[in-house]
């Protein structure tokens, strides 16, 4: 009630969604049902015209099952062009488009190639042919549809980055739905170059110029008290029940995708070998436990491959190398606690853990140790783009980041762009505390720039995010966001 009363404004501005053309940039992991249901809601409330972009022709049947007409679909597929004999890439075209749209092809390709070893073997010419085809198809699509907005839920593939770069260069607004790491709140981002949310920057800049009023202070302090050392996960809005029914549904969805693709995924390891390896490593001596009374800085490992590192932390993707730099920069009376991620510990490449464990002042901590307690007792938290940084802010702990993440806009965060400056940054932040008053202002800015609702993928929240109530929340939030960001 307090939040709604404090931040909800009656905006009498023009309806920025009515009669607009939307391009829905679809993808896997539950994005399709969220986007199709949200599109239907906007069609009924704001009379939008929806088009759907897919990068796989196998999804044709899937979209049919959602009631989407094929004349509303745009498919971009590389198979035909790659089968053309004697085809060579147009190098002049590629260079011209890199300049025109502001990206480097092999920078973006890394997002794709790092996911499977087989992709690293794709020839140079084939990569350029794929990119050339993708760029041309997007240009044709934009010319034919002329969308007003493009909507994405997390960019995780190289096509998503190309789409974003091209559409923004062509004057088309790209809206990304975001989970702001505040339970039952959502926001949007239309500046994915830096991962700094424009509305958050706007609200935080205003708050820095004044004192908090009593109600704002109360809300921010209650949020810190409610946090109380609990972790905020992207799917934490609704507890995910793992039942026989949910397991069956998961495997049914997998089987449906395989059926439409008419081929197995590139690797069956996630389904067959990794669950066995999980159990073996859980009880192995590879990982250590924290030691009482030991001073340490904390670095939680990221899941890889993932957009958090391949896109937003691309200069620091080699985590063992980054940990080695941290180990060289920390005073000799401190250890570095490197905690493995509970969802990634059995899927690391060969030699990954060995590189970390051979550093004498580093402990490789078990993935099952409580992350929040590690942050709470650390002298410093270092992360590329992790949620651990946001959680540490709430505990007024010092944080150093290396990548692009929303909380970098907070004045108390130290972002290291030049690794040669890391030693000085650690010395500056080690064993300090974040000013609580500044923390309360940043939390207030977070609330002021977010909206009631759930941005979690349906499969992670028992489909609550596609309930009628939540879809209405997203639509209202989108309208308010666009009005406020343009005012």
Question: Can you describe what each PLM-predicted range is?
Answer:
Residues 136-198:
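Conserved nucleotide-sugar donor-interacting segment of glycosyltransferase catalytic cores
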Residues 3-7, 40-138, 179-278:
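Conserved N-terminal ligand/cofactor-binding loop architecture of enzyme catalytic domains
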Residues 291-327, 340-343, 447-454, 458:
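Active-site donor-nucleotide binding/catalytic segment of nucleotide-sugar enzymes
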Residues 324-366:
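Catalytic donor nucleotide-activated moiety binding site of glycosyltransferases and closely related
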Residues 55, 114, 179, 297-306, ...:
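Short loop/turn segments at strand-loop or loop-helix junctions that form parts
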Residues 152-153, 367-414:
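A donor-sugar binding/catalytic signature common to diverse glycosyltransferases
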Residues 198-247, 414-487:
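Leloir-type glycosyltransferase catalytic cores
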Residues 15-29, 151, 301-304:
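Nucleotide-activated donor-dependent transferases that construct or modify glycoconjugates
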């Amino acid at each position: 009630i307090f939040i709604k009363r404090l931040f909800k404004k009656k905006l009498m501005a023009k309806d920025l969604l009515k009669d607009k053309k939307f391009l829905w940039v679809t993808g896997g992991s539950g994005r399709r049902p969220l986007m199709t249901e949200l599109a239907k809601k906007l069609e009924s409330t704001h009379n939008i015209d929806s088009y759907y972009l897919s990068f796989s022709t196998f999804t044709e049947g899937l979209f049919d099952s959602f009631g989407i007409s094929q004349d509303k679909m745009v498919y971009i597929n590389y198979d035909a062009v790659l089968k053309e004999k004697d085809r060579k890439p147009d190098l002049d075209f590629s260079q011209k488009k890199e300049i025109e749209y502001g990206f480097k092809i092999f920078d973006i390709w890394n997002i794709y190639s790092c996911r499977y070893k087989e992709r690293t073997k794709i020839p140079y010419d084939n990569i350029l042919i794929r990119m050339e085809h993708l760029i041309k198809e997007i240009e044709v699509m934009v010319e034919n549809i002329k969308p007003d907005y493009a909507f994405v839920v997390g960019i995780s593939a190289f096509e998503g980055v190309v789409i974003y770069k091209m559409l923004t260069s062509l004057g088309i607004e790209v809206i990304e739905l975001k989970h702001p790491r505040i339970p039952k709140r959502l926001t949007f981002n239309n500046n994915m170059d830096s991962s700094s949310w424009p509305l958050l920057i706007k609200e935080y800049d205003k708050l820095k110029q004044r004192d908090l009023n009593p109600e704002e202070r109360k809300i921010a302090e209650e949020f810190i008290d409610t946090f109380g050392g609990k972790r905020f996960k992207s799917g934490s809005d609704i507890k995910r029940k793992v039942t026989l029914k949910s397991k069956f549904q998961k495997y049914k969805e997998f089987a449906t995708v395989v059926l439409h693709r008419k081929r197995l995924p590139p690797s069956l390891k996630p389904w067959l070998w990794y669950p066995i390896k999980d159990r073996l490593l859980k009880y192995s001596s590879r990982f250590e436990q924290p030691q009482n009374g030991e001073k340490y800085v904390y670095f939680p490992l990221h899941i890889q491959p993932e957009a958090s590192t391949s896109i937003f932390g691309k200069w620091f993707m080699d985590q063992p190398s980054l940990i080695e730099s941290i180990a060289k920069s920390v005073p000799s009376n401190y250890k570095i606690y490197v905690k493995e991620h509970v969802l990634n510990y059995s899927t690391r490449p060969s030699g990954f853990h060995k590189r970390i464990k051979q550093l004498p002042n580093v402990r490789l901590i078990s993935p099952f140790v409580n992350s929040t307690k590690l942050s709470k007792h650390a002298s410093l938290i270092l992360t590329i783009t992790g949620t651990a940084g946001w959680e540490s802010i709430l505990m007024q702990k010092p944080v150093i980041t290396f990548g692009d993440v929303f909380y970098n806009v907070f004045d108390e965060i130290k972002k290291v762009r030049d690794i040669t400056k890391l030693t000085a940054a650690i010395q500056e932040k080690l064993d300090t505390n974040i000013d609580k008053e500044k923390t309360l202002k940043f939390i207030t800015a977070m609330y002021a720039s977010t909206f009631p609702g759930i941005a979690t993928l349906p499969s992670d929240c028992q489909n609550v995010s596609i309930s009628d109530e939540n879809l209405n929340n997203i639509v209202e939030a989108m309208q308010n966001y666009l009005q406020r960001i343009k005012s």
